[in-house]
């Protein structure tokens, strides 16, 4: 392990999912069967008709789980969110920030032996287009024993429209797999008849998979 390796990550939740509930239901070929009529707020107005499916909440959970699975498999962030990385010491070489693509560094700070957080001057570091952090020279102040360096940055492709289609398709494959197979599954060939993780979903995500060095 090199000096200044990322030791802990806090990954914020995205504001939306790459795949909508309606897109997932179309992939599953589900038709809404519940019709809800909401009375108008103004007298004489038209009622609002809302349709839904009994499994809507379950499918929403599958959407979130499929996105989390895909991001973990690739080691990347798909929808913009805030990521906070903690290091035990300053990087001894340029640092590849995890869970990219990295859009911008929001702040870098460190914690003194007394636990006081001090922000670093932004002019002393910069970010390359491939998400590598460079520093002109890090502060010499002694750090607290653990997680003394804190890096906050924005990561992700953007909103849902910016997420690559292969990522969305991998999500849909996993959503369909989990919807049809709600019990334990296995990876690889088996004669027991147990369901398998769809290899196509992984193949779609291999292209930009981050492999830690």
Q: What residues fall within each predicted segment?
A:
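Divalent metal-cofactor coordination and adjacent catalytic microenvironments
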Residues: 1-213
């Amino acid at each position: 392990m090199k000096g200044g390796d990322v030791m802990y990550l806090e990954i914020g939740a995205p504001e939306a999912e790459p795949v909508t509930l309606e897109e997932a239901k179309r992939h599953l070929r589900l038709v809404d069967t519940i019709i809800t009529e909401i009375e108008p707020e103004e007298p004489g107005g038209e009622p609002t008709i809302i349709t839904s499916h009994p499994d809507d909440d379950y499918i929403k959970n599958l959407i979130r789980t499929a996105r989390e699975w895909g991001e973990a498999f690739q080691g990347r962030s798909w929808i913009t969110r805030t990521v906070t990385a903690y290091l035990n010491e300053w990087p001894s070489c340029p640092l590849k920030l995890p869970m990219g693509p990295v859009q911008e560094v929001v702040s870098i700070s460190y914690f003194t032996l007394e636990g006081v957080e001090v922000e670093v001057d932004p002019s002393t570091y910069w970010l390359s287009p491939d998400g590598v952090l460079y520093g002109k020279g890090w502060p010499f102040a002694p750090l607290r024993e653990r997680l003394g360096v804190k890096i906050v940055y924005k990561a992700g492709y953007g909103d849902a429209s910016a997420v690559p289609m292969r990522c969305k398709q991998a999500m849909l494959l996993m959503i369909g797999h989990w919807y049809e197979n709600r019990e334990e599954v296995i990876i690889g060939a088996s004669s027991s008849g147990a369901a398998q993780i769809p290899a196509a979903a992984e193949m779609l995500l291999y292209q930009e998979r981050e492999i830690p060095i």
